[in-house]
Amino acid sequence: MSSAVIFVESATPGTLTEFKDLLAKQLLEVRETWSLEFRTYRTLVKDFPSREKLLYSLTFPHHDKKTVLIRNSLAWVLGTAEIPDNLQTCSTGLSESIDQLLASKLSNMWAQRQVIRGDAGQTLLITGDVTVRIINLFAATGFKGLLIELDNLQSATSLANITDLLNEMKVKVFKVASAPGLKSEDVEVVDSSSTMESGNEALFTLAKQYIEVLE
């Protein structure tokens, strides 16, 4: 089972409805709504190598309420109010998220660079048992774009099916991040490959795909 993430920066808020309408013929079931939060932090420690200056935090309520922290090739997959072992001394011991900890106890080390959020996204099951999640994303500056998350892709054909719909909508520019083995000649695929320290590999791969299209 593989995933892919597509981001359409040139979209308008109404693009989501147009895309959903095109999926109607393939629709098997409408499922739960979902949300997303993507944060980027930059280190304030001057002697860090440039490649280590960014930390990414992605919170996925629709994936068991997990938060994925990624810094270079290391990742931590955390549950609600779960703190990595090496940061336990910074925690108050109360129910706090890793983002709350970064904003309070670790604010002298990490500065929040950007926050991208999406709420009330839609989940659709389509032909081929592919799960399509669509959501409008917003940043502090306003509307950011349309994001599409695909789960249970079995082949490049499943991915091309979705990108073909975007082409039908005359969407000329969009970013695609796909797991290895799902490359399509019709789209520019960002390869998501890295190693993780521990945790949920599939969720780590998905988080890397989000970073590739949103950065």
Curated annotation (Swiss-Prot):
Its main location: nucleus. GO terms for molecular function: transcription coregulator activity. Gene3D superfamilies: 3.30.310.180. It comes from the Eukaryota. It is found in: Nucleus. Keywords: Activator, Nucleus, Transcription, Transcription regulation. One of its GO terms (cellular component) is mediator complex. One of its GO terms (biological process) is regulation of transcription by RNA polymerase II. Component of the Mediator complex, a coactivator involved in the regulated transcription of nearly all RNA polymerase II-dependent genes. Mediator functions as a bridge to convey information from gene-specific regulatory proteins to the basal RNA polymerase II transcription machinery. Mediator is recruited to promoters by direct interactions with regulatory proteins and serves as a scaffold for the assembly of a functional preinitiation complex with RNA polymerase II and the general transcription factors. Belongs to the Mediator complex subunit 20 family. Component of the Mediator complex. This is Mediator of RNA polymerase II transcription subunit 20. It comes from Candida glabrata (strain ATCC 2001 / BCRC 20586 / JCM 3761 / NBRC 0622 / NRRL Y-65 / CBS 138) (Yeast). The lineage of its organism: Eukaryota, Fungi, Dikarya, Ascomycota, Saccharomycotina.
